[in-house]
């Protein structure tokens, strides 16, 4: 990477936001979600279809609105984490903050190794083939030079080739 691109990468890392645990507020669309029990004629499919419709209608109503950066892409009960390039943020739902990823009774080294790996993994997505196409504000902006992108793609392909044997 050129020095100029490295500086942009550092700026992107420094401006990255972090969400941990759960959102401060639930989206209003969550209040419209519903589950009809099987005993009342509901089914997994019918419940999924009704709630997908609610989600689609909610998304359509937001078209043209300013991006709500407070929204989460996962529920707190989800044992996962993610990097969102459009918001330049990493998100750690509450459920991942338990063993084996985090244990308040464990040695610091154990937690650093476990949850630290997850954190580093998510940060790395800010600079992978997809994340590198978004700037520190979450705008689609290819800030790597063509040569840097080509070199990255070549190195990535060499790893794919090596592990595909």
Regions found by a protein language model. Name each.
Residues 1-165:
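Intrinsically disordered, low-complexity linker/terminal regions across diverse proteins
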